[in-house]
Design a protein with these regions (language model features):
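Pair of pore-lining "gating" transmembrane helices in MFS-fold secondary transporters
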Residues: 14-42, 46, 219-239, 320
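Short amphipathic helix-loop junctions that connect adjacent transmembrane helices
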Residues: 39-56, 242-259
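Symmetry-related core transmembrane helices of the 12-TM Major Facilitator Superfamily/SLC fold
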Residues: 177-194
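Paired small-residue
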Residues: 100, 111-119, 302, 313-321
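Cytoplasmic helix-loop-helix junction between adjacent transmembrane helices
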Residues: 116-154, 335-336, 340
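Conserved MFS/SLC helix-loop-helix module at the cytosolic interface between two early adjacent transmembrane helices
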Residues: 71-108, 283-289
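Central cavity-lining transmembrane alpha-helices of secondary-active solute carriers
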Residues: 61-77, 266-278
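Juxtamembrane intracellular "pre-TM" segments in multi-pass secondary transporters
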Residues: 2-16, 197-227
Length: 353
């Protein structure tokens, strides 16, 4: 009895420690992926891009490159995580991001910056890998809460990235900012290497694994969550590129509109940060399907009045409330997939989500 209790206590300590390491690691790597947004046009200009249209083109390509390759390779890393271990994938991602970010500060041409951004997305994936590890290592009754905490770290990184990128280059220069960011991510690599402990489960027989690989064997709830996750991202992100233009209709100053648009976007992320752990814990108690369904309805209702606001503060309030609803959905989607996934294909199924 004592030995069994000791094993349970040890596992309890490990999953909580893993959660905080993954949350801090996701926070720092998301900062790295988003911090160049404020100074990207200036950096491209220093690399020899002169025309305004060319700067806009290169900015869009360079910024989106990381997220494109990260999305395309997430299922692959999820599959490899199931086979070789989730901790190993996080070590790979943090070390790869540290190297790529440091090299970005040494770029001498726009194409080099784009190539390094592509490389960062290809070698990265720390946040998605953390989601897989936390979801698979956390007790099922705590999955919603744990994923909510991790989601808050991801959202906080998305907010802090542009803020850091707006401050540090003025203090130390753009190239030094990249080098400092690479050094911070290297610390994340060390924390992942020495502090993270994965509780590996013995693999299933080959016949069972082969059955799990067939599309027909994938549980229907998992397929529904894939579609729900795609629609969730589409609904929440599709309007963000035009928020600045929308806000500009309420203020004559374009510079002022940019600041206000940043506040509007931050309001959504702030709402998600505040709501994710609380709604995740609530979903663990009352049911993930119930909370997810309610959140989808609330988001749909909150989207409609955003088209009819007459002042920026109204849009801020609506986007904040929408962030509260959105913050609880990702933990629910992840928890539902986790509950229906086998021990050896959790990473693959979460990677597709």
């Amino acid at each position: 009895m004592t030995g069994s209790s000791g094993e349970v206590a040890e596992q309890h300590v490990y999953w909580q420690r893993n959660l905080w390491v993954c949350t801090l690691g996701s926070f720092t790597t998301l900062i790295a992926m988003t911090l160049l947004l404020p100074f990207l046009p200036l950096y491209l200009h220093s690399l020899g891009v002169e025309e305004e249209a060319s700067i806009a083109h290169w900015s869009a390509v360079a910024y989106g490159a990381t997220f494109l390759t990260a999305a395309l390779t997430a299922p692959l890393w999820g599959r490899l995580a199931d086979k070789y271990g989730r901790k190993l994938m996080l070590i790979r991602a943090s070390l790869g991001m540290a190297v790529a970010m440091s090299l970005m500060g040494m770029a001498t041409a726009p194409w080099q910056l784009v190539a390094l951004r592509l490389l960062a997305g290809l070698l990265g994936g720390y946040a998605s890998g953390s989601m897989i590890l936390v979801a698979s290592q956390t007790p099922k009754e705590k999955t919603g809460w744990a994923v909510g905490i991790l989601s808050s770290g991801v959202m906080a990184g998305n907010i802090a990235g542009p803020l850091v990128g707006g401050v540090l280059p003025g203090w130390m220069g753009i190239r030094a900012t990249f080098l400092l960011t690479g050094a911070i991510i290297f610390i994340t690599f060390l924390a992942t290497l020495f502090l993270l402990k994965e509780q590996r489960q013995p693999p299933k027989k080959a016949t069972a694994s082969a059955v799990e690989e067939t599309p027909a064997a994938i549980p229907l709830p998992v397929k529904i969550m894939w579609v729900s996750g795609m629609l969730l991202v589409f609904a929440s992100m599709s309007v963000e590129p035009i928020i600045t233009l929308y806000v500009a209709t309420f203020t004559p100053s374009l510079q002022h509109a940019t600041l206000l648009a940043g506040i509007v976007m931050a309001a959504t992320a702030l709402g998600s940060i505040l709501a994710a752990p609380r709604i995740g814990a609530l979903a663990d108690r009352v049911g993930h399907w119930r909370v997810l369904s309610f959140g989808l309805v609330v988001c749909g209702i909150l989207l409609i009045p955003q088209a009819f606001v007459t002042a920026v503060w109204q849009l801020v309030v609506l986007r904040f409330c929408m962030g509260l609803a959105l913050g609880g959905m990702l933990p629910c989607i992840t928890a539902i997939i986790r509950h229906h996934a086998g021990a050896n294909n959790t990473g693959r199924l979460l990677g597709y989500s």
